[in-house]
Amino acid sequence: MIDVPRTLAPAAGVATRYSLVPPRGGNPLWSTAVALAPVAGADGAEVPLSALVAGANGHSRADALLRGAGEAVERRALHPDDRLGTVRGTAAGLGRPALAAHDPRNALAHPDSARAELDWYPATRLSDAATVLVPAPLVDWPATAPGSLFDPGPSGAASGGSAGMALRSALVEIVERDAFTTAWGRRLRLPCWTDPFAAAAGTPDRPTGEALRALWRRAADAGVRTVFARIPTAVDGLCCVVACLLEPERPGALVTVGMKASDRPHDALLGALQEAWQVRAALEATLLDGPVADVPDPLVTEHDRIRYMLTARARRAVRDWAGGFVPAPAPMTAAEVTTDGIVTALLADGADPHVVDLTPRLPATVAAMGWRAVKVVPAGYQHLRMDETHEWSWNRSRLASAPERTGCPARLTDHRAAAPHPLP
């Protein structure tokens, strides 16, 4: 049985310490921060912060703590080691089926990766349950391969109290990332609402409704405008929601975006709004070190993107996108979506997800509680880009088909004209 305090205890091997902070200042959410066990064999000074620390915000103490524990287990499982059945070689020399990550239809690696000697992990291809090798840099965080060949990151990984829960969460995340990145790259005119309770039919459960109303009103009381939008996806019944917190323009104003997909629309609205508040808190924390200057261009790291989000250029880009949203003709409705249904819809939409079981990397005590972790490599879909220097990491077919797939007109014809996306 999942035991959150035991999961986060140093003896379990996931974390060295953690903190739980109640709402304070301008942050209306509970916050959990978890210092992860060190990355074996890595110089801590060169490890990205998100591989050293896991964090999560929630509308309640229990929500923040559970989210923080799940995030910590997921990030710990991404730390590279040799427990996944590593194979070393070039794609041509493996003698086994391997994912062509460099194929433009996947856009997950530089073309030179096709000839590079890499570590590979076995994955299950969901289309036929075949075992296929995938490049380790598409799984590990931090990655050890040259940054010029891949655009690694933690997206597509998830943990849960069962293998099925972890897989579902990871699949939903790759849907979110594909939907958001292509919608941003084409500046789609998304259907939107300013009132979250007009955005979803029916009545939410009491905790969800109270939390959603409290966060929405908190923004209004602070003079921050809230806009919710839906990105249509191939998965019928899955509500993919974007929430924008738009502070009036002034020096030092904060503008943030969050997103969440769920077959329960009120949960999607709450999750997206929580994430927008969480990003806002991260920006406020960054400002404690003083005004931001010398933001790298192009952006390469997650830290670069957080700093970029404090610039007037970033604020203008988000305001411009939200300004192009159109009133939604009807509210979202709840509809049960099964994991099998998600997989079927993804395959029909051109995705070819490959699943790597990360559970062997979890400490025995944690796995014995029931924790499971996976990473879904989103072949065929647009991944969440981190390094803006990689032109090859745009999935051009997904960008080209976005208006037709979603039914949302595009304001940009060339994705290269889009500003960097606002999801740190």
Segments predicted by a language model, with ranges:
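Helix-biased "structured C-terminal domain" signature
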Residues: 1-424
